[in-house]
């Protein structure tokens, strides 16, 4: 059995430069060559996980099957690889220090002076190797978040440097992703920041084996030659990843430039042809779609689109197979409350709406008003998580006539708590990792819209919530025409909808269908929504 291979992806110049998509693309390219691949994201922040972080600071919290609240890049990895990952695929500084300090308190270090080297770096390497050992992967790709030079990332870069020594040159491959900025005033693409970034990486003791240069537009050969010379690399080891409209074309761009071939040749001593036929078919379908549909995205974190990135991607997946291109109308629900945005105008412009997840008081009434308008106006509407809970609140107020109905999350004193805290959440006072999280079985009611989308009674979907539809009010809601189309094993409401005779498509789910959507296997809920929107558009 050949030794396990490790690919380490680092970044330079600035964060959010494209390391995550580069990692996901390489994972796909190696997987398409028949290798088993795992992808890990390292986040150097001291938080234990992303669960308590503001979406404006960090973007979406991606929930894994086992209930991990992880970085959004884990979502990219899952979508490109087409496989489920776990909480162990997202390593943070908080996890590492928590583990090392716990071991020290337990006496595991036998009186040693606990230091960054070797104790912290050993823990980092152990976490990386554990993912490979558990899965038996041929290749483990590790993306180190942040940029070279960040003080928070130094222990992780040191651990990566040690891995080259311990695992061997032929079993490790370092890729550095750095930005070559474009200056519109002079029309120049500058390579100096990339050169300085490589220099900083070398100071730490890491020589990159390939450099992926991010740029606004394709770089001239002279610029790539400069970078290759400075990095002490052949020209073929400098890859240009320029801006493209469709992220799902990126693996094809990197394949054309030979990135996976470089990695495979070094680590496995051979070159094989990938099978990208199904991926290419999806890309062609997505890019061929010309009929546009307008979808209102009603939420409270709309100023940072990464807050809802899995929902955006799930829409793309479903739309490609329907032959339409979604045009997203971002609607800040707080602006509806303030009167800055006219909900009637949103309704007239959009072909359908998604009421997005979120927590807390801000923007709630704006979401409820949007739900009312799309329900009464009979345009397709999909509510997710908090969007489902507020759909129930809206229905209770405007159909049942319970004008003061609310969720106790927003109004603990409401006389009609149609949404209330889950029984299992009572008495919990810590926020981190304590919600109802991860994949849970969902029992779908036959004869409903949801059943027509899944075609079966049992499904597994991911969750992230503390509140439920209050069972005390379920019978009254059903008598008033609301359909409960799915239940949990514990008896919680998992989905509500309206009958097709009452509304062309009104569906809201407690679970998050977006987390399991894949380019080659779109989520049924999003397929149903997009089909309804496309039908309305004509």
From Swiss-Prot:
Q: Which reaction does it catalyse?
A: UTP + L-glutamine + ATP + H2O = CTP + L-glutamate + ADP + phosphate + 2 H(+); L-glutamine + H2O = L-glutamate + NH4(+); UTP + NH4(+) + ATP = CTP + ADP + phosphate + 2 H(+)
Q: What else is known?
A: CTPSs have evolved a hybrid strategy for distinguishing between UTP and CTP. The overlapping regions of the product feedback inhibitory and substrate sites recognize a common feature in both compounds, the triphosphate moiety. To differentiate isosteric substrate and product pyrimidine rings, an additional pocket far from the expected kinase/ligase catalytic site, specifically recognizes the cytosine and ribose portions of the product inhibitor.
Q: Which SUPFAM superfamilies match?
A: Class I glutamine amidotransferase-like, P-loop containing nucleoside triphosphate hydrolases
State its role. Answer: Catalyzes the ATP-dependent amination of UTP to CTP with either L-glutamine or ammonia as the source of nitrogen. Regulates intracellular CTP levels through interactions with the four ribonucleotide triphosphates.
Organism equals Aeropyrum pernix (strain ATCC 700893 / DSM 11879 / JCM 9820 / NBRC 100138 / K1)
Which one GO biological process term can you cite for this protein? 'de novo' CTP biosynthetic process
Q: Where does UTP bind?
A: 15, 190-195, 226
Per the record, the similarity remark reads:
Belongs to the CTP synthase family.
UniProtKB keywords: ATP-binding, Glutamine amidotransferase, Ligase, Magnesium, Metal-binding, Nucleotide-binding, Pyrimidine biosynthesis
Instruction: Give the gene name.
Output: pyrG
| Binding-site residues, ATP | 16-21, 73
Q: What class of enzyme is it?
A: ligase
Listed pathway(s) = Pyrimidine metabolism; CTP biosynthesis via de novo pathway; CTP from UDP: step 2/2
- The active site is formed by 385, 512, 514
Subunit notes for this chain? Homotetramer.
Which residues are listed for CTP binding in this entry? 15, 150-152, 190-195, 226
Please give the name of this protein. Answer: CTP synthase
Domain Glutamine amidotransferase type-1 span(s) in chain numbering = 294-538
